[in-house]
Amino acid sequence: MSVTAERKAEIIKANATKAGDTGSPEVQVAILSERINNLTSHFKTHGKDNHSRRGLLKLVSTRRSLLDYLKKNDEARYKALLEKHNIRR
């Protein structure tokens, strides 16, 4: 369910705005989106796993907060991020 270190490194490399960038909203949203997608596929087989569902809701809320911040400060980056990760808004 969690993202492996190798996968996380790939995500960071693909979404970093500069070398060593791990804290930008784009990178954080990309990692959260990967975790959300993993949990979503988990729920296809484990529909009654309410403990993990709560964690999913927290991840979605955190991603939403980051997206709201990005929308408020730089709408072009926000729209590009939604497009890149196929996030519905």
From Swiss-Prot:
Keywords: Ribonucleoprotein, Ribosomal protein, RNA-binding, rRNA-binding. InterPro entries: Ribosomal_uS15, Ribosomal_uS15_bac-type, uS15_NS1_RNA-bd_sf. Transmembrane segments: none annotated. SMART domains: Ribosomal_S15. GO terms for cellular component: cytosolic small ribosomal subunit. It holds the Pfam family Ribosomal_S15. Disulfide bonds: none annotated. GO terms for molecular function: rRNA binding; structural constituent of ribosome. One of its GO terms (biological process) is translation. Belongs to the universal ribosomal protein uS15 family. One of the primary rRNA binding proteins, it binds directly to 16S rRNA where it helps nucleate assembly of the platform of the 30S subunit by binding and bridging several RNA helices of the 16S rRNA. Forms an intersubunit bridge (bridge B4) with the 23S rRNA of the 50S subunit in the ribosome. Part of the 30S ribosomal subunit. Forms a bridge to the 50S subunit in the 70S ribosome, contacting the 23S rRNA. This is Small ribosomal subunit protein uS15. The gene is rpsO.
